[in-house]
């Protein structure tokens, strides 16, 4: 046990302005307490939402900003009231690091929907210090917002599961879509989409990948194990697939029409939005009404669901398809990610990188 009373500094890579360019930044870690873990970051995934934040696409960014919310690390020290973790444990943490602990979502293991949640970066913690993310040597996180990484899952493979993995696992469970035999669609084959294929297939679903071009067909069918592939501009193919899917994960992070995909859903089908888009999406209401279809959304998952998802992935042998990079490559990686030039998630080897 440690008191965690002394102030610590660390070095991360931060954006200073909406250009989004990251460079070394040394800063003080937030005040720590008896429920906190002091963690050495081992690996951190690179998510498309990191781009939205560092470039102020949502109009709420504060600088300097150290991004990164798919974090796996090693516990260096624990507070006096920590009961679940010990020094040396390998743990993961995600985009939410605080909540009010008293609202309905918090009391029902859905703390990610707390209106007073604290983001792991680009936010302010309860002690007034800015939160900073996982593109850094060390972090401090409360015990409630940490999960143990199962043995057998490599750190760099586990990191994307903290966001991309649970983003698809949670709605499948919450919306009653976990049973085998369902027919699902994955719109967009990126970091979240490729995990959607893997997790849905592991649940026994028939999976159709829907993409804007034919270039990912072989990857989707032969490498990820999808059952079918649709090109959204193929009018005949889209027409043949009308009323064929129980659900579609819409992972696309840019404005796009919804009508072509609503048409693919069966009666009571669900279009589940998971891509962050800072502009209105449009559809005509009869496409929803006449099939009792739902357009809904889902945001990551609870810590309980994250634990379940990690065990599920371990049991099924599921891992992320990744490209491991050093921190000095992260700006190039962000540029490539904007162009969808990655299969399928960049992961920063933080512990193996020179940070200053």
UniProtKB/Swiss-Prot annotation:
Superkingdom in the source lineage: Eukaryota
Keyword annotations: Lignin biosynthesis, Metal-binding, NADP, Oxidoreductase, Zinc
Family annotation (InterPro entries): ADH-like_C (IPR013149), ADH-like_N (IPR013154), ADH_Zn_CS (IPR002328), CAD-like (IPR047109), GroES-like_sf (IPR011032), NAD(P)-bd_dom_sf (IPR036291), PKS_ER (IPR020843)
Binding-site residues for Zn(2+) 1, renumbered to this chain: 47, 69-70, 163
Source lineage: Eukaryota, Viridiplantae, Streptophyta, Embryophyta, Tracheophyta
Subunit: Homodimer.
GO MF assignments: cinnamyl-alcohol dehydrogenase activity; coniferyl-alcohol dehydrogenase activity; zinc ion binding
UniProt family annotation: Belongs to the zinc-containing alcohol dehydrogenase family.
Role: Involved in lignin biosynthesis. Catalyzes the final step specific for the production of lignin monomers. Catalyzes the NADPH-dependent reduction of coniferaldehyde, 5-hydroxyconiferaldehyde, sinapaldehyde, 4-coumaraldehyde and caffeyl aldehyde to their respective alcohols.
Binding sites annotated in the UniProt record for NADP(+): 49, 167, 188-193, 211-216, 251, 275, 298-300
Binding note for cofactor: Binds 2 Zn(2+) ions per subunit.
Gene name tied to this protein: CAD2
Catalyzed reaction equations: (E)-cinnamyl alcohol + NADP(+) = (E)-cinnamaldehyde + NADPH + H(+); (E)-coniferol + NADP(+) = (E)-coniferaldehyde + NADPH + H(+); (E)-sinapyl alcohol + NADP(+) = (E)-sinapaldehyde + NADPH + H(+); (E)-4-coumaroyl alcohol + NADP(+) = (E)-4-coumaraldehyde + NADPH + H(+)
Pathway this chain belongs to: Aromatic compound metabolism; phenylpropanoid biosynthesis
Pfam family, one: ADH_N
GO BP terms: lignin biosynthetic process
Record-given protein name: Probable cinnamyl alcohol dehydrogenase 2
Cofactor: Zn(2+)
Binding site for Zn(2+) 2: 100, 103, 106, 114
Record-listed E.C. numbers: 1.1.1.195
């Amino acid at each position: 046990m440690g008191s965690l009373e002394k102030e610590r500094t660390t070095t991360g890579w931060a954006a200073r302005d909406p250009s989004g360019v990251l460079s070394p930044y040394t800063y003080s870690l937030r005040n720590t307490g008896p429920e906190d873990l002091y963690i050495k970051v081992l690996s951190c995934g690179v998510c498309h939402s990191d781009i939205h934040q560092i470039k102020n696409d949502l109009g709420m960014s504060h600088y300097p900003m150290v991004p990164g919310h798919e974090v796996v690390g090693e516990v260096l020290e624990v507070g006096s009231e920590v009961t679940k973790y010990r020094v040396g444990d390998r743990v993961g943490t995600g985009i939410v690091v605080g909540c009010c602990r008293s609202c309905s979502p918090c009391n029902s293991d859905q703390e990610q929907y707390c209106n007073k949640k604290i983001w792991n970066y680009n936010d302010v913690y309860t002690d007034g210090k800015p939160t900073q993310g996982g593109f850094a040597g060390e972090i401090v996180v409360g015990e409630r917002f940490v999960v143990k990484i199962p043995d057998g899952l490599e750190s760099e493979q586990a990191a994307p599961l903290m966001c991309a993995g649970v983003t698809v696992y949670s709605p499948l469970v919450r919306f009653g879509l976990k049973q085998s035999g369902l027919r699902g669609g994955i719109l967009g084959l990126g970091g979240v989409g490729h995990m959607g294929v893997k997790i849905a297939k592991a649940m026994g679903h028939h999976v159709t990948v829907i993409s804007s071009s034919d270039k990912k067909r072989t990857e989707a069918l032969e490498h990820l194990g999808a059952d079918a592939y649709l090109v959204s501009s193929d009018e005949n193919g889209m027409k043949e697939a009308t009323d064929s899917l129980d659900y579609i994960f819409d992972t696309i992070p840019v404005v796009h029409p919804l009508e072509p995909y609503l048409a693919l859903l069966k009666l009571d089908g669900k279009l589940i939005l998971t891509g962050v888009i800072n502009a209105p999406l449009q559809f005509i209401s009869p496409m929803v009404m006449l099939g009792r279809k739902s357009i809904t959304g889902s945001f990551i998952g609870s810590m309980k669901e994250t634990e379940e998802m990690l065990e599920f992935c371990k049991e099924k042998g599921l891992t992320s398809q990744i490209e491991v990079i050093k921190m000095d490559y992260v700006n190039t990686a962000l540029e490539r990610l904007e162009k969808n030039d990655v299969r399928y998630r960049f992961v920063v080897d933080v512990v193996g990188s020179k940070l200053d």
